[in-house]
């Protein structure tokens, strides 16, 4: 699996240390093991997880601005855990409402010795944001409109929303409230992945 990951990273132009690669593989192995009992993901093959979960998450890392992020609706830690491994200087709050997912995240935190994550069980609407976050990240969480509505209290004045999407979400962008603007849309290149991937970066308009 290490060889496959190394080839995928090379194709993506991403350079990681051996320690980071081993952490990513350990996370995939844990996800595969726990998935049998906890049903954390529909992806069953660890090699497929490398593409659809690991690479699909970490290609976002160069576009994140700031040091303090929250991954809302993180599920089994996607994209938050892979991002925390490749961005060890940043801190990631991993938010999910289901206890079994948060238990898995805490076990990952313990086994991989990840000091820059904080798994939290909470609904996003009820989670306090003190201090506010530099970035609110979501992957397969909600429409853009729902994301900014439910998470409006989380980013700071200069904070951004980072929404990981499949195809270009033109309809969702058109429905964004006028107090928000799309700062950029990045077409992501994920090696060995069928289908499109886009990152939509949103900021609140200054009043």
From Swiss-Prot:
Pfam families: GidB. InterPro entries: rRNA_ssu_MeTfrase_G (IPR003682), SAM-dependent_MTases_sf (IPR029063). Changing residue 165 to A: Slight decrease in activity. Streptomycin-sensitive. Induction: Induced under stress conditions known to stimulate ppGpp accumulation and down-regulate rRNA synthesis. It is found in: Cytoplasm. Mechanisms acting on transcription regulation, translation or protein stability could be responsible for adjusting RsmG expression to rRNA synthesis. Changing residue 79 to A: Lack of activity. Low-level streptomycin resistance. 11-fold decrease in AdoMet affinity. Disruption phenotype: Low-level streptomycin resistance. S-adenosyl-L-methionine binds at residues 73, 78, 124-125, 139. Specifically methylates the N7 position of guanine in position 527 of 16S rRNA. Requires the intact 30S subunit for methylation. Its EC number is 2.1.1.170. One of its GO terms (cellular component) is cytosol. GO terms for biological process: rRNA base methylation. Belongs to the methyltransferase superfamily. RNA methyltransferase RsmG family. It is an enzyme of class 2 (transferase). One of its GO terms (molecular function) is rRNA (guanine-N7-)-methyltransferase activity. It catalyses: guanosine(527) in 16S rRNA + S-adenosyl-L-methionine = N(7)-methylguanosine(527) in 16S rRNA + S-adenosyl-L-homocysteine. PANTHER family: S-ADENOSYL-L-METHIONINE-DEPENDENT METHYLTRANSFERASES SUPERFAMILY PROTEIN. It comes from the Bacteria. This is Ribosomal RNA small subunit methyltransferase G. Keywords: Cytoplasm, Methyltransferase, rRNA processing, S-adenosyl-L-methionine, Transferase. SUPFAM superfamilies: S-adenosyl-L-methionine-dependent methyltransferases. The gene is rsmG.
